[in-house]
Amino acid sequence: GHGRSSIDSHFKLPIINTPIQKLYETDFKPFKNLCFSSYAMTAHVRYATIDKLPVTFSEKIIQEIIREYIGFKGLLITDDISMGALKGNLSKRAELALNAGCDLVLHCSGDISEMYKIARILPEFKSSFANKTIISNIRKDKKTININILRDEFKLMLHKY
């Protein structure tokens, strides 16, 4: 998370230099308690003692820490891929995030031309997307996600507010 940084990732990449053991002892613990959540979002921060890449692009952090150590098996969504913390064109950013193990790429600017650029690198979605687990074809660990269950949980979350 962003807890150890005062940098706003909308504009610049926060870099956290905390020793890895301290991160495991304190920072990652709360996430272990939330490992059964259906959804989670990556933070655009860099843990310098773990990887040179931001979390969103780091296969090491996503696979070894989020998926294995924390035990998160749900849908992993990027924070807004167009934020200033990340470098490179949007298509490359989306590709790096998916290759690292994110399931969905979030794009929030509303710029349709940017959306088209990102969509070009994504796998083709069939009309039966809601009934199939297309995300499992993207995922590195190939575990199936039940899209229908996630959709129903999302609807319930919307009705809470």
Which ranges hold each PLM region?
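N-terminal hydrophobic targeting/anchoring segments and the immediately downstream early-domain regions
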Residues: 159-161
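Second-shell residues forming the walls of enzyme active-site clefts
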Residues: 2-129, 133-144, 149, 156-157
